[in-house]
From Swiss-Prot:
Species this chain originates from: Proteus mirabilis (strain HI4320)
Name by which UniProt lists this protein: NADH-quinone oxidoreductase subunit I
Assembly mode: NDH-1 is composed of 13 different subunits. Subunits NuoA, H, J, K, L, M, N constitute the membrane sector of the complex.
Gene responsible for this protein: nuoI
Catalyzed reaction equations: a quinone + NADH + 5 H(+)(in) = a quinol + NAD(+) + 4 H(+)(out)
InterPro entries associated with the record: 4Fe4S_Fe-S-bd, 4Fe4S_Fe_S_CS, NADH_quinone_OxRdtase_chainI
Keyword annotations from UniProtKB, A to Z: 4Fe-4S, Cell inner membrane, Cell membrane, Iron, Iron-sulfur, Membrane, Metal-binding, NAD, Quinone, Repeat, Translocase, Ubiquinone
Membrane topology annotation: Peripheral membrane protein
Cofactor(s) needed: [4Fe-4S] cluster
Sequence positions that bind [4Fe-4S] cluster 2: C70, C99, C102, C105
Function: NDH-1 shuttles electrons from NADH, via FMN and iron-sulfur (Fe-S) centers, to quinones in the respiratory chain. The immediate electron acceptor for the enzyme in this species is believed to be ubiquinone. Couples the redox reaction to proton translocation (for every two electrons transferred, four hydrogen ions are translocated across the cytoplasmic membrane), and thus conserves the redox energy in a proton gradient.
Cofactor note: Binds 2 [4Fe-4S] clusters per subunit.
GO CC entries: plasma membrane
Protein backbone atom coordinates (compact mmCIF):
# COMPACT_ATOMS: atom_id res chain seq x y z
CA UNK A 1 0.00 0.00 0.00
CA UNK A 2 1.48 3.33 -1.04
CA UNK A 3 1.32 6.61 0.79
CA UNK A 4 -0.96 8.05 -1.89
CA UNK A 5 -3.52 5.26 -1.43
CA UNK A 6 -3.34 5.64 2.34
CA UNK A 7 -3.99 9.41 2.21
CA UNK A 8 -6.81 8.97 -0.32
CA UNK A 9 -8.49 6.31 1.81
CA UNK A 10 -8.14 8.42 4.96
CA UNK A 11 -9.52 11.47 3.13
CA UNK A 12 -12.54 9.48 1.96
CA UNK A 13 -13.29 8.35 5.50
CA UNK A 14 -13.00 11.91 6.87
CA UNK A 15 -15.25 13.24 4.08
CA UNK A 16 -17.88 10.56 4.84
CA UNK A 17 -17.86 11.38 8.56
CA UNK A 18 -18.13 15.11 7.72
CA UNK A 19 -21.18 14.50 5.47
CA UNK A 20 -22.86 12.40 8.17
CA UNK A 21 -22.26 15.20 10.66
CA UNK A 22 -23.82 17.78 8.33
CA UNK A 23 -26.91 15.65 7.71
CA UNK A 24 -27.35 14.89 11.41
CA UNK A 25 -28.23 18.54 12.10
CA UNK A 26 -30.13 19.31 8.89
CA UNK A 27 -33.93 19.76 8.82
CA UNK A 28 -35.75 16.45 8.40
CA UNK A 29 -37.87 15.93 5.33
CA UNK A 30 -39.97 13.16 6.85
CA UNK A 31 -43.24 14.38 8.31
CA UNK A 32 -44.35 12.65 11.51
CA UNK A 33 -47.91 12.15 10.21
CA UNK A 34 -50.23 11.39 13.10
CA UNK A 35 -48.54 13.90 15.40
CA UNK A 36 -48.14 16.63 12.77
CA UNK A 37 -51.10 17.45 10.50
CA UNK A 38 -50.53 17.07 6.77
CA UNK A 39 -51.10 20.15 4.62
CA UNK A 40 -52.68 19.01 1.36
CA UNK A 41 -53.17 21.13 -1.73
CA UNK A 42 -56.52 22.98 -1.99
CA UNK A 43 -57.55 20.96 -5.05
CA UNK A 44 -56.50 17.62 -3.56
CA UNK A 45 -58.84 14.80 -4.64
CA UNK A 46 -59.80 12.78 -1.58
CA UNK A 47 -63.06 11.41 -0.14
CA UNK A 48 -66.11 11.62 -2.42
CA UNK A 49 -69.30 13.10 -0.95
CA UNK A 50 -72.89 13.58 -2.15
CA UNK A 51 -74.19 17.11 -1.57
CA UNK A 52 -77.58 18.75 -1.14
CA UNK A 53 -79.03 21.76 -2.96
CA UNK A 54 -79.96 25.01 -1.13
CA UNK A 55 -83.48 23.65 -0.51
CA UNK A 56 -82.07 20.70 1.44
CA UNK A 57 -82.91 18.07 -1.19
CA UNK A 58 -80.20 15.77 -2.48
CA UNK A 59 -78.71 17.03 -5.72
CA UNK A 60 -78.17 13.67 -7.40
CA UNK A 61 -80.67 13.01 -10.19
CA UNK A 62 -79.46 9.44 -10.83
CA UNK A 63 -78.37 10.21 -14.40
CA UNK A 64 -75.74 7.44 -14.15
CA UNK A 65 -73.03 9.54 -15.83
CA UNK A 66 -70.66 9.09 -12.89
CA UNK A 67 -70.95 5.31 -13.06
CA UNK A 68 -70.49 5.35 -16.84
CA UNK A 69 -67.34 7.50 -16.76
CA UNK A 70 -65.68 5.69 -13.82
CA UNK A 71 -62.65 3.83 -15.25
CA UNK A 72 -62.67 1.14 -12.54
CA UNK A 73 -66.45 0.77 -12.17
CA UNK A 74 -66.61 1.44 -8.44
CA UNK A 75 -69.87 3.47 -8.54
CA UNK A 76 -73.30 1.84 -8.72
CA UNK A 77 -76.74 3.38 -8.35
CA UNK A 78 -80.44 2.77 -9.04
CA UNK A 79 -82.81 5.48 -10.25
CA UNK A 80 -86.19 6.15 -8.62
CA UNK A 81 -88.76 8.93 -9.07
CA UNK A 82 -90.64 11.17 -6.60
CA UNK A 83 -94.33 12.00 -7.06
CA UNK A 84 -93.41 15.42 -8.50
CA UNK A 85 -91.30 13.78 -11.23
CA UNK A 86 -87.94 14.49 -9.66
CA UNK A 87 -85.40 11.68 -10.02
CA UNK A 88 -83.26 10.51 -7.13
CA UNK A 89 -80.98 7.53 -6.48
CA UNK A 90 -82.77 4.74 -4.65
CA UNK A 91 -79.33 3.50 -3.65
CA UNK A 92 -75.91 4.98 -4.33
CA UNK A 93 -72.81 2.93 -3.60
CA UNK A 94 -69.07 3.66 -4.00
CA UNK A 95 -66.47 0.97 -3.41
CA UNK A 96 -63.49 2.98 -2.13
CA UNK A 97 -61.25 -0.09 -2.16
CA UNK A 98 -61.36 0.13 -5.98
CA UNK A 99 -61.60 3.92 -6.40
CA UNK A 100 -58.49 5.60 -7.83
CA UNK A 101 -59.70 9.14 -6.95
CA UNK A 102 -59.28 10.36 -10.52
CA UNK A 103 -62.11 12.92 -10.25
CA UNK A 104 -63.83 11.96 -13.50
CA UNK A 105 -67.11 11.35 -11.64
CA UNK A 106 -67.04 14.92 -10.28
CA UNK A 107 -66.41 16.33 -13.76
CA UNK A 108 -69.19 14.26 -15.33
CA UNK A 109 -71.84 15.16 -12.73
CA UNK A 110 -74.21 17.77 -14.25
CA UNK A 111 -75.73 18.69 -10.88
CA UNK A 112 -72.47 19.03 -8.88
CA UNK A 113 -73.85 16.39 -6.53
CA UNK A 114 -70.59 14.43 -6.44
CA UNK A 115 -67.66 16.37 -5.04
CA UNK A 116 -64.18 15.34 -3.97
CA UNK A 117 -62.99 16.72 -0.64
CA UNK A 118 -59.41 16.99 0.67
CA UNK A 119 -60.09 14.35 3.34
CA UNK A 120 -57.73 11.41 2.79
CA UNK A 121 -57.97 9.45 6.06
CA UNK A 122 -60.05 6.47 4.99
CA UNK A 123 -58.20 3.57 6.56
CA UNK A 124 -60.30 0.56 7.58
CA UNK A 125 -59.46 -2.87 8.95
CA UNK A 126 -61.98 -4.74 6.77
CA UNK A 127 -62.40 -4.26 3.04
CA UNK A 128 -66.20 -4.40 3.39
CA UNK A 129 -66.08 -1.18 5.44
CA UNK A 130 -64.73 0.67 2.38
CA UNK A 131 -68.03 0.21 0.53
CA UNK A 132 -69.94 3.42 1.28
CA UNK A 133 -73.72 3.61 0.88
CA UNK A 134 -75.78 6.74 0.20
CA UNK A 135 -76.21 7.49 3.91
CA UNK A 136 -72.42 7.44 4.40
CA UNK A 137 -71.80 9.72 1.39
CA UNK A 138 -74.60 12.28 1.82
CA UNK A 139 -73.56 15.42 3.70
CA UNK A 140 -75.89 18.05 5.11
CA UNK A 141 -74.53 21.02 3.14
CA UNK A 142 -74.15 22.12 -0.48
CA UNK A 143 -70.37 21.66 -0.63
CA UNK A 144 -68.34 23.79 -3.05
CA UNK A 145 -71.32 25.38 -4.83
CA UNK A 146 -73.72 26.71 -2.18
CA UNK A 147 -76.10 28.64 -4.48
CA UNK A 148 -76.44 26.14 -7.34
CA UNK A 149 -79.83 24.46 -7.69
CA UNK A 150 -80.07 22.10 -10.66
CA UNK A 151 -83.87 22.09 -10.91
CA UNK A 152 -84.03 25.91 -11.01
CA UNK A 153 -81.58 26.07 -13.91
CA UNK A 154 -82.60 23.14 -16.11
CA UNK A 155 -86.12 24.06 -17.11
CA UNK A 156 -87.81 20.95 -15.72
CA UNK A 157 -91.38 20.94 -14.47
CA UNK A 158 -91.44 20.63 -10.66
CA UNK A 159 -94.06 20.97 -7.93
CA UNK A 160 -96.92 21.64 -10.35
CA UNK A 161 -95.06 24.37 -12.27
CA UNK A 162 -94.52 23.98 -15.96
CA UNK A 163 -91.16 24.44 -17.63
CA UNK A 164 -89.99 28.05 -17.41
CA UNK A 165 -92.37 29.07 -14.61
CA UNK A 166 -90.06 28.45 -11.63
CA UNK A 167 -87.95 31.17 -9.97
CA UNK A 168 -84.75 32.15 -11.79
CA UNK A 169 -85.76 30.18 -14.85
CA UNK A 170 -86.04 31.31 -18.46
CA UNK A 171 -88.86 30.19 -20.72
CA UNK A 172 -88.00 27.16 -22.84
CA UNK A 173 -86.83 27.90 -26.37
CA UNK A 174 -89.27 26.93 -29.10
CA UNK A 175 -86.94 25.23 -31.58
CA UNK A 176 -89.58 25.25 -34.34
CA UNK A 177 -89.68 29.05 -34.34
CA UNK A 178 -85.95 29.12 -35.06
CA UNK A 179 -86.38 27.45 -38.44
CA UNK A 180 -86.14 29.69 -41.54
Amino acid sequence: MTLKELVTGFGTQVRSIWMIGLHAFAKRETQMYPEEPVNVAPRYRGRIVLTRDPDGEERCVACNLCAAVCPVGCISLQKAEHEDGRWYPEFFRINFSRCIFCGLCEEACPTTALQLTPDFEMGEFKRQDLVYEKDDLLISGPGKYPEYNFYRKTGMAINGKDKGEADDEAKPIDVKSLLP
